[in-house]
From Swiss-Prot:
Enzyme class: transferase
EC number(s) stated in the UniProt entry for this protein: 2.4.2.18
Known partners and oligomeric status: Homodimer.
SUPFAM superfamilies: Nucleoside phosphorylase/phosphoribosyltransferase catalytic domain, Nucleoside phosphorylase/phosphoribosyltransferase N-terminal domain
Binding residue positions for 5-phospho-alpha-D-ribose 1-diphosphate: 81, 84-85, 89, 91-94, 109-117, 121
Membrane-spanning segments: none
Protein name: Anthranilate phosphoribosyltransferase
Binding site for Mg(2+) 2: 225-226
Length: 333
């Protein structure tokens, strides 16, 4: 089917199949849609909502076009959120990736510039002295040797540049925000994925199930694309294609709820200062709690089933200062 026909189907409120969406998104990545066509597509999808079939088709197109990364044969995971929750918190996922590596996990962190906060994962890591543009073979070596690497989305998904002017002009969340966490070029089968809206939990989980991930958590925590320290976290757990929905509270991790305001972030330099203090074991208790809760769930992907025990173990690792050593090693690649 021609691109124009596929566009017309979407504008007429018809859902595309996965293969149709893959074809259409391949056209976007190759720069074949003009700005008016792309705007119509993005806004129509946003208003009616993207189906799991459509998201999985777009993911397939993006991964097929991505620059290659040598996927490891050992167990590794990613922890990443859609962004776009407008909460402007510290970089919980990035800090959790570093702490997770200090706990002995293998984490290939996929990330980009900021979406809704002042500081995205790549902004923070740059401020911390990490080379976010390291070649794929060097990033893979870091993952092998220290258990952590960062894959900068713009380096691997070159075709996204064709959509940048339209996305900047629209100034609203689109399917591109939804795709980010699902298109890690390392292709992890284990992921902790945060979404900016509770309405995304179900389509995201169904997409993950279609993509054949081994074990994944999709979370939304009281307005955050993270596990929440301030209230309930809605969870979709996908294990070997089966989806289970439930909720978690800070008490499940052994903590009392803390105010969201305590996680407020700032510019990259400010966030880097706060995250460095955290990794040294000298950060705010609320920051340590947020990272402990998210890393505890991340550990469950590797078979550590008791999240309360995991959270305490993470706090011990944070206090030990091991995490800042992992960061220091990463800056040398």
């Amino acid at each position: 089917m021609q691109t124009e026909q596929l566009l017309l189907k979407i504008i007429e409120q018809t859902h595309l199949t996965s293969s149709e969406m893959q074809q259409l998104f391949t056209s976007i990545i190759q720069g074949e849609l003009n700005p008016i066509q792309l705007t119509a597509l993005l806004i129509t999808l946003k208003i009616r909502g993207e189906s799991a079939e459509e998201i999985s088709g777009a993911v397939a197109a993006c991964l097929n076009a991505a620059q290659p990364f040598p996927t490891p044969d050992y167990a590794f995971a990613d922890i990443v959120g859609t962004g776009g929750d407008s909460a402007n918190t510290i970089n919980i996922s990035t800090a959790s990736a570093i702490v997770g590596a200090a706990c002995g996990l293998k984490i290939a962190k996929h990330g980009n510039r900021s979406v809704s906060s002042k500081t995205g994962s790549s902004d923070l890591l740059t401020a911390l002295g990490v080379n976010i543009n390291m070649p794929a073979d060097i990033a893979r070596r870091a993952l092998d040797e220290i258990g952590l690497c960062f894959l900068f989305a713009q380096q691997y998904h070159l075709g996204f540049k064709h959509a940048v002017p339209v996305r900047q002009a629209l100034k609203t969340r689109t399917i591109f925000n939804i795709l980010g966490p699902l298109i890690n070029p390392a292709r992890p089968k284990r992921q902790l994925l945060g979404v900016y809206s509770p309405h995304l939990l179900k389509p995201y989980a169904e997409t993950v199930a279609q993509l054949g991930h081994q074990h994944t958590f999709v979370v939304h925590g009281c307005g955050l694309d993270e596990v929440a320290i301030h209230g309930r976290t809605d969870v979709a757990e996908i294990y070997d294609g089966k989806i289970t929905y439930y909720s978690l509270s800070p008490l499940d991790f052994g903590f009392q709820a803390k105010p969201l305001e305590s996680l407020r972030g700032g510019e990259p330099a400010e966030n880097a200062q706060m995250i460095t203090a955290l990794l040294q074991g000298q950060g705010k208790p609320e920051h340590a709690q947020a990272v402990a809760m998210n890393t505890a769930l991340l550990m469950k992907l590797f078979g550590y089933e008791n999240i309360k025990h995991n959270a305490q173990q993470v706090l011990d690792v944070i206090q030990s200062g091991k995490s800042v050593n992992v960061l220091s090693q990463l800056t040398r690649y």
